[in-house]
Amino acid sequence: MREDKHMINFPQDFLWGTSTSGPQTEGRFAGDGKGDNLWDYWYQVEPHRFRFQEGPGLTSTFYENWEEDIELLVETGHTAFRTSIQWSRIFPEGRGEANPAGVAFYRQVFERIKSKGIHLMVNLYHFDLPFALQEEGDGWENKETVYAYRDYARFCFETYGDLVDQWITFNEPIVPVEFGYFYDAHYPHKVDAAAAVKVAYHTQLASSLAVQACHEVDPNYRIGVVLNLTPAYPRSQHPADVKAARIAELFQAKSFLDPSVLGTYPPELVEILRERALLPEVDPNDLELIKEHTVDFLGVNYYQPMRVSAPRYAPNPESPMLVEQFYEPYVMPGRKINPHRGWEIYEQGLYDIAQNIKENYGNIEWLLTENGMGVEGEEKFRQNGEIQDDYRIDFVKDHLRELHRAIQDGANCKGYLMWTFIDCWSWLNGYKNRYGLVELDLATQERRLKKSGHWFRELSQQNGFEE
């Protein structure tokens, strides 16, 4: 006997949309006045490190096609949209004279988005430091970059504040720390733990200064930070495994979550760094500023869990310090996985994140700002001219069930934003894995809705979905 279907409904005024970033969608065009960021420069000197040598100049041509793309936001039912301003499009050298073409571009884009009744969230930094600041002073290792960022942020608040509903200081600030200073995976591809810690500290200080500047420009402006709050699960309840998971979350999540929301750093993390002589020089006034200027809300990105165990081997005393000295990945038998991306799919992790925020971070307001499924070779799922991405729809539904359960249990979540609106360029993988509700034909730049794009419109219109 078939059970009657029922609706999973979300709270009134719940936001539905997607997230993207300027570096991954805009592209570069003659006369646009944009300066090089780290990715532009790195691609110029080491194109072989990018899949198929697909660089940041390719992307999804949003700079030229923004009007069509905004119409597609409407067609896919967006009530919210998160994008980013490219620092080097506004200030080609990171500071100094603003680029009039860049300033005007974002103004017209934001005005058009708002004219469609879409809630606009704008991120100020998505891994895209102006290269001039890296070249002249080692980028985020130099405190002068912190002040350059503060001035750039204030300029944006003053220039676009009348159009932006929610500001974001940084997207996933732990990622450049890990991949740029621990793992030789992002520029400046160093392996230097002391530099990594200094970069993390300066990034947090910059975020707090931006919060201060935002509220100085207008106390009613709302500003937050987007963090990938990947929960860490121990292999077992053995004390060594439990400790490994706790330390993994210290580095991965709490290193930015605690100072951003609580205004303080976790004492255990500070002690670990002190024992290894990795603490940077800290001005007590800076710590007071971090304490006083916490965020108004959180953006949470969630794709996969971490599963860890205690390290099996003692670290080589002559090797550089890596966080894997404290924990190592654990491959759980029977896990569900996205074979295209190699990531575990674990929907309950989203519920666990919500509980953590509720119980340990004052149930601060938050939105799920990234969640999605990247798939390679989606063209094989095309029928009658449209990609039938039922796997993506199922992925979203499965996560929304857990999010709905969390909200029912008191989570203060105000919206769900997928990654991403249109197939976009990924930092080192180019267009290998497609995430969009809208298909991008790289050869023609034609945009075509996938099945998920039509479904997402229904999801938004119904404020939920039928089981």
Segments (PLM) and residue ranges:
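Catalytic domains of carbohydrate-active enzymes, especially glycoside hydrolases
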Residues: 65-86, 292-297, 360
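Glycine-rich, proline-tolerant flexible connector loops at the mouths of alpha/beta enzymes
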Residues: 85-98
